[in-house]
């Protein structure tokens, strides 16, 4: 299953969120990677306990749990707090499988993650790359569920995290 989740935010809200994210400090993304995926992960991430990550994470979870398509497709019992990632020129997250069990920061609670979601804040015309590529039947197939294109800001997708996949970004700088 792979679904597109439209209009999680208005374009204006997405732009405001993006500006706030652009103005904050980012860390090495390997911080939250499991042992295997740390070998493939080369991106930046907002610290899980960063006040902006908590504020925006709560807002995203609130919007998703009010979104009829997300709720009917995902049927979540729990929603793990979102992680905020960004990619600079030449960075990527090579072939990996998302962690099946995640630990909540500052807690002993562990959450099984049966669904992964990505929400976009940057217009696709402002960067090159960013496609999700899934690995199926020992072949690199663009989108086991069909091609997953880069989405408009305030859109996202959700799907099975179990297959190997990669995310790459060629050049995140806006075109002149």
Curated annotation (Swiss-Prot):
Its cofactor is Fe(2+); L-ascorbate. Its EC number is 1.14.11.-. InterPro entries: PKHD_hydroxylase, Pro_4_hyd_alph. Transmembrane segments: none annotated. GO terms for molecular function: 2-oxoglutarate-dependent dioxygenase activity; iron ion binding; L-ascorbic acid binding. It is an enzyme of class 1 (oxidoreductase). GO terms for biological process: DNA damage response; intracellular iron ion homeostasis. Residues 78-147 form the Fe2OG dioxygenase domain. Keywords: Dioxygenase, Oxidoreductase. Binds 1 Fe(2+) ion per subunit. This is PKHD-type hydroxylase Mfla_0096. It comes from the Bacteria.
């Amino acid at each position: 299953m792979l679904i597109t989740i439209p209009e999680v935010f208005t374009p204006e809200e997405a732009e405001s969120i993006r500006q706030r994210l652009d103005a904050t400090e980012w860390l090495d993304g390997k911080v939250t990677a499991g042992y295997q995926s740390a070998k493939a992960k080369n991106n930046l991430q907002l610290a899980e306990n960063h006040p902006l990550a908590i504020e925006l994470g709560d807002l995203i979870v609130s919007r998703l749990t009010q979104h009829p398509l997300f709720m009917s497709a995902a049927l979540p019992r729990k929603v793990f707090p979102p992680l905020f990632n960004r990619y600079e020129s030449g960075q990527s997250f090579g072939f990996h499988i998302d962690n099946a069990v995640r630990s909540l920061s500052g807690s002993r609670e562990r959450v099984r993650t049966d669904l992964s979601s990505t929400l976009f804040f940057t217009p696709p015309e402002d960067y090159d790359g960013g496609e999700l590529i899934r690995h199926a039947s020992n072949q690199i197939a663009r989108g086991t569920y069909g091609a997953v294109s880069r989405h408009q800001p305030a859109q996202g997708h959700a799907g099975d995290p179990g297959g190997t996949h990669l995310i790459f970004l060629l050049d995140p700088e806006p075109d002149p």
